[in-house]
Amino acid sequence: RALKAEKYFDTNNADVYTMDINPYSYQQEILDKLEAERTVRGYTHNLVVAATGTGKTVISALDYKRFRKQNPDRPCRLLFVAHREEILKQSLYTFRAVLKDANFGELFVGNYKPESIDNLFLSIQTFNSQSFTEKTRPDFYDYIIVDEFHHAAAPTYQKLLSYYQPRILLGLTATPERMDGKNILPYFNNRIAAEIRLPEAIDRKLLCPFQYFGVTDTVDLDALKWSAGGYQKSELEHIYTFSGAVADRRADHVVTALLKYVTDIDEVKGLGFCVTVDHAEFMCRYFNDHNIPSMCLTGQSSGEERAAAKRRLVSGEVRFIFVVDIYNEGVDIPEVNTVLFLRPTESLTIFLQQLGRGLRLSEDKECLTVLDFIGQANRKYNFEDKFAALLSNATRSVSREIKDGFVSVPKGCYIQLEKKAAKYILDNIRASYGNTAGLVTRVASFTEDSGLELTLKKFLGSLPS
């Protein structure tokens, strides 16, 4: 069994499995709310919404530990489902630490094959490819956790969610809102059991504050093709990378803005989020050519390459890592103090995950500096939800916040939009309210977004003036 533990992790650090892991006060509040949902309301399907960096996995492990204690005569079989191997590995490690059991659970993802499926950390891709329901009864698992539950409205999750009948279903997410309008709340009696969103997490000093600069972009995306909820990556890549003087001018603008807004370039430990591999490599070359040491990582980069990049960034050997499709979920470099959004991000979930990469607390880190390059956008692009997610007061419209100078930011935070960038956003918001589909969507999600009861007066009060 000790060998089984060593398959995944270095088990030389025995202290991890002997120390008690106790919840922080805010985590205990969430655990208490979960218990109340089950004992008072009788709801055993529960959704926890917690900002990136507040320890969703630790909360789930502590909740499962309590469930085992309450059910000593049951096998308490656990199924933990996620869509990335990195998340599953980290989650298994967390559960072993919380349960103080170096042999608890097994992975079933990629090249990992379990000896037992009793306590399993399973990728949704493996579940679908292995005809997993044929191996288990609907009630085989007592406790099922689905991480990043905002993915669960996708067809790939439907078989799992409709087949199994666990005693407890726990959904974890930082953002329950989905771009495609599909609602995940019906899985949970249309309730969020407990939540701690990003503004509250910053106010409680669980995450570091941010200074957010909306920089006017040099490129116009208004004429680019919009389909299936977003821009075409190939078109964005062309304009950012292969458009000759246009791409060079934009890259130069990024460097100029960076030097303008950061206090000391030599202290920067930054991530730059790019649209494609070619774009990331282009930005990396441009920064290196302008004496800002940088690296590039992609979803194809090996674990060794990622570890080396992290070491070089933390040590100050490089200032930036330009990335594509990684550092969204489940990867931590707490020392990151600067984030560049070098592409429009249609998904609110991905935006918050990428922002969250820089919001981790770290010694000698006072705040996160964010540079978001904002150009003229397609009228269907949603600026409003992005900024609303950064504000503590959900009752004020983003348009009003822009005009008033973002008075509802969390403690110690700051949002500043350059003049043209602010105009692009305001024009975009006005256009989105000018079509019927946009209004219907906002009415449908008003209560969930604002926390207020839907009345005509309250809804009209939320509209931009």
Residue ranges and their predicted role:
Residues L348-Q353, R357-F387:
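Conserved segment of the helicase C-terminal RecA-like domain
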Residues I192-L271:
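Conserved interdomain linker/interface between the two RecA-like ATPase lobes of SF2 helicase motors
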Residues E86-V109:
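Conserved helix-turn-beta segment of the N-terminal RecA-like "Helicase ATP-binding" lobe
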Residues K89, L107-K113, F132, E281-C284, ...:
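Conserved helicase ATPase core of P-loop NTP-dependent helicases/translocases
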Residues H151-F213:
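Post-DEXD/H (motif II) to motif III coupling segment of the RecA-like Helicase ATP-binding lobe
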Residues E237-R311:
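Conserved helicase/translocase motor-coupling segment
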Residues R1-A51, V58-C76, Y93-A97:
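ATP-dependent helicase/translocase motor core
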Residues Y17-M19, R250-H253, K260, D385-S465:
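Long, largely alpha-helical accessory region at the distal end of helicase-like NTP-driven motors
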